[in-house]
Amino acid sequence: LGRLGAEHIMVVHSDDGLDEISIATETHVAEYRDGALSEYKLQPENYFSERQSLEGLAVENATESLALIIDALGKQTNANGAKAAQLIAINAGAALYVAGCAADMHQGVEMALDAIGSGLAKAKINDLATFTQVQQDG
C-alpha cells in the first residue's frame, strides 16, 4: 500500500476473527508510517478497564444494526450498547490516529469517546442519514 501512495495505514486482525480492532481479545496490527512497517499487538484493556465479550453484538439485519448503533451513540441503555460504543470508539480512535487527527491511539480513542459522550457522533450520523436521504430523493 505504501507503493500506492499510502502515508499511514493500519491493517488489523483480531484473535476472535474480526477484521477490526476487538474489545474482546488481542488484535494484530501491521502499521505502515513514514515509509516504515511495524508489527505489534493491541490489548483492549490498555484502552478500557477490561476486555468485553462480543456476545450481544451480532445482528441479524439492518434494523437490528441501526438500533444497536443508535443505542451505542446515544444513552447506551443496555450492556450491548455500551460494548458497541467501546467497539466503535477503539476503531474510530484508530482512524483518527491514522488520519493524523490524534497523536496516538490513546488520544484517538479518547477523542472518539468524547464525541460519543457529547452527542457529536450521533449528530454526525444523523447528518449523514439526512444527506443520504436528500441524495436519494434528489
Question: PLM features: what roles do these ranges have?
Answer:
Residues L1-G138:
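Glycine-rich anion-binding loops and their surrounding alpha/beta cores
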